[in-house]
Amino acid sequence: MRRLCRRADVILPNLTEACLLAGKPYCESYTERDISNLLQALQELGPNAAVITGIGYERGMTGIAAAAGSEALYYPHARYPQIFHGTGDIYASAFTGAWLQGKSLRDSVRIAADYTLACIENTRDDPQHWYGVKFEPALAELIAAVTGKDPS
């Protein structure tokens, strides 16, 4: 997998996957410096950008840490106590769509995080919905964010 990173424009691992790729031990607690070092190690594998999901520095918060060259950023958002299956795939898909439309790293991170959070918020109060998130109601917002056009 590490060899494939040399050919990637962007890699989008969660924290566990990022540690495995970088050959670093996984830790339950970490600092901003730890994540900065992890992003640097991922960039040394060769991708143009590295984006790590599931990074939280404060209780009740999670977010996205990303780096490309000398640009580094962190985009925080609310963390919910429930587990929502498929959110990594939702995030990666939304990020890729924004990135391929020419959005910057910062904008792609933001658009994908906001969309994923909207999908979670559409789902979190439905105890019968156990098999993923309700992504369809937020698609119009995603399209508008990526294209800058009202999809209606």
Which residues are covered by each model-predicted region?
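Short, small-residue alpha-helix embedded
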Residues: 20, 82-105
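Charged C-terminal helix
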Residues: 106-152
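Conserved phosphate/ATP/ADP-binding segment of small-molecule kinases
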Residues: 1-72
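Glycine-rich beta-alpha junction loops
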Residues: 17, 54-58, 78-81, 112-117
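Short pre-catalytic strand/loop immediately N-terminal to key active-site residues, enriched for Gly-Thr
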Residues: 72-85
